[in-house]
Amino acid sequence: MIHSNEPLPYAIEYAKSGRSNCKTCKKNIALDQLRMSMNRPSTFFDGNMDSWFHYNCFWIKMIRGRDDINISSIRGVDWLRWEDQEKLRQEIQHFKTASPPTLTPLCSTTTVILSTIKTEKSLSNRGKCGKCGQNFERGEIKAHNKGKANHFKCFLQEFDKISGTVEDIPGWADYEENFKIKAVGEYVEALAAKRRSTEPATPASASPTPPEAETPVLSAEGSPESSNKRPASSEIIEIDGEGNPDENDFAKKRRMKKEARLMEVQKKRMKKQSDLLWEYRQIFERMPYTDKISILRENEQDIPEGHDPTAQVIERLVDNALFGCPIICQTCSNGKIVYNSSCRTYVCTGYATEYSKCTYESKNPIRTPFEVSHRLTEKHKLQDIVFNQMSERLYIGEEDGESVVKIDKRKSKGGTRGEQFIYAAEAFDSTNNVPIKVGDLTSTNTHIIKKGTVVDAKFALADRCHVFKNEIDGSLYQATLSFTDLTQNKNSYYKIQLLKDDQRENYYVFRSWGRVGTEVGGNKHESYSNSNEAILKFQDVFHEKTKNDWIYRKHFRKMPGMFSYVETDYSEFAQITDTEITPGSKTLLPKSVKEVVMSIFDVENMKSALKSFEMDVNKMPLGRLSHNQINLAFEVLNDISDLLVKLPIDASRILDFSNKFYTIIPHNFGMRVPEPIDSFHKIKEKNNMLNALLDIKFAYDQISGGDVPASTSLGIDPVDINYQKLKCIMEPLQQGCDDWNMIHQYLKNTHGATHDLKVELIDILKLNRDNESSKFKRHIGNRRLLWHGSGKMNFAGILGQGLRIAPPEAPVSGYMFGKGVYFADMFSKSFFYCRANAKEEAYLLLCDVALGNVQQLMASKNVSRQTLPAGFQSVQGLGRQCPREIGSYNHPDGYTIPLGLTYMQLQGKQDVDYHLLYNEFIVYDVDQIQLKYLVRVKMHHARHL
């Protein structure tokens, strides 16, 4: 079982100091005073924070109907004195059952109408009646009046008259039979008592029988019962159609008594356990801290670290002293077993892998006896203290099964969401609703570019500092760290920069941290007068957070529970030069070519395209993640894909690889818990995201410098510079020419039956990529002009590098016929891969594809260049709807254009029906592809039917 380590929403304890103040009354909470907290997400770090209250002030803060609480949602109950545990349970019971006065209009009347009262079943025997103060029986009927829960008998005593029968009580049928019998008897007695109290004022001629409307018990014939005595149980049960009621009632009473005895025994044992725990606590609290640590070490137990280690040391000593010492974890072999008050169970402190905690848990693990050395026994006079008195920890069953209440967490704020940080995606899933506000890449609200480096704008002196460089190798003293753990709902970043003043010999080690995609976080800095001290501090912080040495970061190894180093590429910022030329103002390129170049190299367009993938663009300067980092992420997806085909699915390893992926490619989930990558659909989405990142990185690298030296680009329009970098000639087709008309006809004729689509043809550019024609394998024949759709942001990479096959690191899952380049003979099929919105332009390619001999397949099959059967050069996935061959056009350049009207093929081949709606053509060698046309269309509407 994978347990969640998310903090519980509430906590209770005896104040460990006298320094905290109550959040309600603002007064001091004294040392050892009982206090409660509301645990909510912090605004200062990626985690939760306790807001403490006096015990009574906490319950004033809680509002019925808005807040919910139960024992399972409170941390620390196990460590309270027994009387305080009982006090807490009664308070919770009162909070849950009591009703506001405004909801009990009966309190000001002397007549109770049974059909309008509020009742419920007592969930335990701990609650007490608001009138007589006696405990309820478990399962007993409780009636509410004036905000208090009463016995049904006590409730009836509050009124002068009773209107209705017990069967009128809402939910009457849901109560247990023995308590219904008891309630009927109490009801009859109450009626008789009220009648006797009014008898002196009753005329002699009046009937002694209550009015029919107030008679609760019916005879077997259905007539009112005239006797004033409590009716026999057999008569009452007979009303409900029960058979042999005496025997049934006896058995139920016997069972109830047995359960009550067992509950009483369990309660006494729990009290004993609590008293012993508290006795041991008092012993260990008197010891010096060094002696406590010595005892833990003697018993081969871990020494707690982190927040409030002293309290954790005492709790572990107390637990071990009473029950014995848990042995080392047998699941991961590197962690110790400790009691977790939030989970109400024992968990492992170790890590199964460098990315995931061990998921071991047990209510009562295997233990060894707890021992104290002779020296410490003599020193603290422990000779008369008996340890290891209980072999198993006891739990209250009904509380152990309760679910933790759900609390509305504070949601991610909009705008520029906190600290600048490099991360790739919002959630990149169909359920994410976190809004994205696209900011300006060069805005000082995000970062400041100084001397080819990016200075964190949160630093107060950022405008007069730059990132310090190593004088030997030129590397920058800055690090971006990431940590994601789904079980703890952690999605953290940590940034370190060593900054130098532009003018003076002043150095600053600046740190910022928080939760990715939110304003949660903080920052700090230290000042130094020389570089050596600053470098040592920078290296110390890096080692503290990662347990790796800075000088060996190129061989970084992720350590369990520590941050991971996110490898980033800042080289493009060193090449950015200011230009006074407005892009497009001086170029002599044709208008349509200029528009395409400006579009595919426009940073804002890249951001808008990334937004469609729900990627965050405010804190990810484009191109920052390195190729190596992206390839590592591909490998993780491949590992997850391999896990999903093996049954049963290993949920722990899925969790581990998900943590690893989100750590390598930081995502923004806001305050939501990161989702495991546990399906092929999610793998495909993440795979598409990584491919998009590669294309954007290529485009931005071209913008930042590419192959054109900055010295030769002075005075040249940026559009011309970027066009040269593409090394792809683009020539607009004359509207109305033969090729234009032919392509327009191809576009109109090949709309799929399942696609509701309306587009407008804007422009067609003829393409000629540098050296592509010379490599093109036209000799294998069977050339066709086929469609290929892609997001606009990918076109700088496509035009500059050609269409490419997915890298070896990418998973095979998501590709119906293996890793290759996919084409279609249906315009509408390829169009949906463009991810365009209404009124936006989309770009599609028409490619001359040398198919050669085609292997035709009816269903999915993993194919590669190496596994293609001998004599075949491509694969065709056969679809039901396709263009008629009779309408194809043989172009003078040597390829066929399948622009015929489409038709439905009614019968499959070789007795196998069609799995695909439309044809797919796949080649596994990029030299079988030659880009011919870029088609610009404007979308009016598009949807799948």
UniProtKB/Swiss-Prot annotation:
Pfam families: PADR1_N, PARP, PARP_reg, WGR, zf-PARP, Zn_ribbon_PADR1. One of its GO terms (molecular function) is NAD+-protein-glutamate ADP-ribosyltransferase activity. Residues 324-369 are annotated as: Zinc ribbon. InterPro entries: ARTD/PARP, PADR1_C_dom_sf, PARP, PARP1-like_PADR1_N, PARP1-like_PADR1_Zn_ribbon, Poly(ADP-ribose)pol_cat_dom, Poly(ADP-ribose)pol_reg_dom, Poly(ADP-ribose)pol_reg_dom_sf. Its EC number is 2.4.2.30, 2.4.2.-. Residues 237-248 have a biased composition (Acidic residues). Residues 586-704 form the PARP alpha-helical domain. Zn(2+) 1 binds at C22, C25, H54, C57. It is found in: Nucleus. Residues 195-251 are annotated as: Disordered. Signal peptide: none annotated. This is Poly [ADP-ribose] polymerase 1. The gene is parp-1.
